[in-house]
Amino acid sequence: MIKTLSQALRMDKERFKVPKSVQQAIPIQRIWPDGIFQQGTKFSKTYRFTDINYYIASKDNKTEMFLDYSELLNSLDSGISAKITINNRRINKEEFEKSILLPMKEDGLDHYREEYNEVLLSKITGTNNSIYQERYLTVSVHKRSIDDARTYFARIGTDIVTHLAKLSSTAEGLDAESRLQIFRDFFKGDVPQAFPFDLKQFAKKGTSFKDWMCPDSMEFERDHFKIGDRYGRVLYMQDYASYVKDDMISELCDFSRNLILSIDILPVPTDEAVREIQNRLLGVETNVTNWQRRQNANNNFSAIVPYDMELQRKETKEMLDDLTTRDQRMMFGILTMVHLADSKKQLDSDTELLLSIARKHLCQMATLKWQQVDGLNTVLPYGLRKINALRTLTTESTAVLIPFHTQEILQPGGIYYGQNAVSKNLLVADRKKLMNGNSFRLGVSGSGKSFSAKEEIVHLALATDDDILILDPESEFTKLVEALGGQVVKVSATSDNHLNAMDMDAAYGNEKNPLIEKSEFILSVFEQLVGAGNLSAKEKSILDRCAADVYRDYIRSGYTGEVPTLKDMYRQLMLQPEEEARGLALSSELFINGSLNTFAQPTNVNKKNRIMDYDIRELGEQLMPLGMLVTLDSIFNRVIQNWKEGKTTWIFADEFYLLFRYEYSANFFYRLYKRIRKYNGFVTGLTQNVEELLKSDTARLMLANSEFLILLNQASTDREELAALLNISENQLSYITNVAVGSGLIRCSGNIVPFENTFPKNTDLYKLMTTKPGES
């Protein structure tokens, strides 16, 4: 027997004591706050890591992930035990629903909240949304003291985090409470905590930490066990196929039940492994030589070596070649899994289903007979291995049991954006938790991008007190905003709604002196009126002087009374002695006293409404530059005021590519995009014209730096551009190619997840959000 294996078996061997209580049945002797557990001389530490998009990756990407995962396995030290665990944990249904459903507010909008909640509940029913999958890597090592163990885990923990980061998986070491929570969830299910976990209080009172996590009762039978009122069974992989597909583990775990699957790995030093295989090869060659000698003695000189001997020789040589030339390591492994059910009948049915999945992959799973206790202690991430039905594996054959499937997005307190196209789980993201929560929604006309944005607006309007500002070039949001009690501002030369370009109060801008920023804005206004870039230094000085004169009385009155307008600015220019002043007045006359004077009137709309829709559809080409300037100034100052009051602001800009036709609006949004996170705000850009948007280097930079993107159905030319810019694989591109309305890819924090999103047509919310003719 290999020295490493015999040593591990000897050190893990311990006397069996009949447990006299449920607490004694839990094989943890001692714990430390940093998450290290002790059992005899063995110390263990658990690391939680996130899933990655293995299922939808291209063949080349899968190969790369496989090699990176193999590298992680090769990095495991000899003499340790590693346990990779997938935990299908059932979420408390009431808590889950409470976290995503909208509470009623009795503000006249509860009808919409009820509809929205019904839609969410329909998405939960019949899916795995009550099951949350977590992944752990538990490392166990024999050490003399906790200090030695802590030093070791500090080193190996860094290696584990680094190797998993190469796979785009985030890993973290679990502290004592997080680690014990795994066992509590398994043993107690949905039973609420009677008291919070506090290690110091346990020590102070002289009680055991096991009281917090252990079940009321545990009964072990020949081939199953019972925890409280629930039934469970431990299975193990008895026989493996010659070739195992890499999706077997994900298929076994794609099951709407509480289950835990663990793969125990015992790495062997390469020198020991090579020596062992050489000895085995020598034994095989000796058997072949002895067989040939017997045949020769019988004058049978042409006899062919028996197939079984030839196969042994071939497989042993291949194994030796793997170890010596292909950087493979020998490992001993065992796969175990435990599943729970509410009844014995359901348990037997689930067991048969799991066994059939294994048979489909030409593997043989079996129930542990009279070893359910040892099996349970092996499969749970204690860091122990009580079942010794070990199989000799190489790095490659171990890596085939890859624990990755598809990424999920489930951030507490977030917004529902659809369902994972692979797992059908809800995708709930919280943009406030991202480093840069700005977003783009990209898709061809009719792909569902404005509907998706409206869904987000509905959630924000019904669930939060945040302010929502919409730049609406196509009048698409008018009906929804009015239904939600918002203010629609029609910005045009003929509209009865007016926005005063000279609006200013004490909170204007982000400086101590609002006049400084307002004067700078007035210069920008007159640049648009006279012609971009045509203001001379003398004209700028005249405008600055006039602005100070116009605002003097208003500022002295404490920003009360009538706010000056561009007409006051015109009169002040006419009073100046310089010829240039009259030239400025004449150049701007069309927009102040002429037919396009809508921004020279006092503001007559409620700019304090929390939902504002700036409808600029009828803003003509002549008025568009000035209209964009005034509208964007109004939006930005609302953001600043909200920031000072501690409020969050969400800005939605439809047909985003239009903004990049004008230098001022393009520069404004670029600056806003970079700065708005500082002011507790978030920008969302929507566009169908991706190709035109990507012609702007500024827009490309904004798109590449966005942490949250929703990509819907794309035109072929746009797909290629986006794939290159956002590093989207060919397989992932298939999810934005000729797909159903509302389906596509979500990119969140660098993770790309395919999604689908449908909304019932027989609801009032759908009629408010749809833009399809005949449905609204």
Where does each model-flagged region fall?
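Extended, folded cores of ATP/NTP-driven motor/assembly subunits in large transport
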Residues: 1-404
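P-loop NTPase motor domains
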Residues: 52, 59-78, 85, 89, ...
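Hydrophobic anchor at the beta1->P-loop junction of P-loop NTPases
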Residues: 441
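Conserved lysine of the Walker
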Residues: 449
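Hydrophobic positions on the alpha1 helix immediately C-terminal to the Walker A/P-loop
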Residues: 452
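Post-Walker A helix-loop "phosphate-sensing" segment adjacent to the P-loop in P-loop NTPases
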Residues: 459-469
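Structural recognition of the conserved hydrophobic beta-strand(s) that form the central parallel beta-sheet
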Residues: 468-471, 650-652, 676, 682-688, ...
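A short helix-turn-beta junction within AAA+ P-loop NTPase domains corresponding to the substrate/partner-engaging
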Residues: 485-489, 698-711
